[in-house]
Amino acid sequence: MAELGEADEAELQRLVAAEQQKAQFTAQVHHFMELCWDKCVEKPGNRLDSRTENCLSSCVDRFIDTTLAITSRFAQIVQKGGQ
């Protein structure tokens, strides 16, 4: 197998990082849905009633908002540390 050039290695690292981010995002979505399902769904049926749909939507929205706020705050801390 031929050795990778510097540019090829950088591209490979970028692709691996992108795939890791996708996997992390997917895992996070599944985690949110599992937590929200346990919180909101009392009796699974053929269809979700409007109360359950609203609960699931609000629950996931709260988790996303919280994650974004924490990520933003962490980025601010990192940026201040780099100055």
Swiss-Prot record:
Q: Which UniProt keywords apply?
A: Acetylation, Chaperone, Disulfide bond, Membrane, Metal-binding, Mitochondrion, Mitochondrion inner membrane, Protein transport, Translocation, Transport, Zinc
Q: What subcellular compartments does it reside in? A: Mitochondrion inner membrane
Q: Does the keyword Iron-sulfur apply?
A: no
Among the record's GO biological process terms, what is one?
Answer: sensory perception of sound
Q: Which SUPFAM superfamilies match?
A: Tim10-like
Q: In which tissues is it expressed?
A: Ubiquitous, with highest expression in heart, kidney, liver and skeletal muscle.
What S-S linkages are listed for this chain?
Answer: 36-59, 40-55
Q: Return the Pfam families for the record.
A: zf-Tim10_DDP
Q: What membrane topology does the annotation report for this chain?
A: Peripheral membrane protein
Instruction: Give the matching Gene3D superfamilies.
Output: Mitochondrial import inner membrane translocase subunit tim13 like domains
Family matches, as InterPro entries:
Tim10-like, Tim10-like_dom_sf
Tell me where the sequence motif Twin CX3C motif sits in this chain. Answer: 36-59
Modified-residue entries (N-acetylalanine), positions? 2
Which is one Gene Ontology cellular component term of this protein? mitochondrion
Predominantly, its location class is mitochondrion
What does the function comment of this entry state? Answer: Probable mitochondrial intermembrane chaperone that participates in the import and insertion of some multi-pass transmembrane proteins into the mitochondrial inner membrane. Also required for the transfer of beta-barrel precursors from the TOM complex to the sorting and assembly machinery (SAM complex) of the outer membrane. Acts as a chaperone-like protein that protects the hydrophobic precursors from aggregation and guide them through the mitochondrial intermembrane space.
The free-text domain remark for this protein reads: The twin CX3C motif contains 4 conserved Cys residues that form 2 disulfide bonds in the mitochondrial intermembrane space. However, during the transit of TIMM8B from cytoplasm into mitochondrion, the Cys residues probably coordinate zinc, thereby preventing folding and allowing its transfer across mitochondrial outer membrane.
**What subunit structure does UniProt give?**
Heterohexamer; possibly composed of 3 copies of TIMM8B and 3 copies of TIMM13, named soluble 70 kDa complex. Associates with the TIM22 complex, whose core is composed of TIMM22.
* Protein name per UniProt: Mitochondrial import inner membrane translocase subunit Tim8 B
Which species does this protein come from? Homo sapiens
Q: Which gene encodes it?
A: TIMM8B
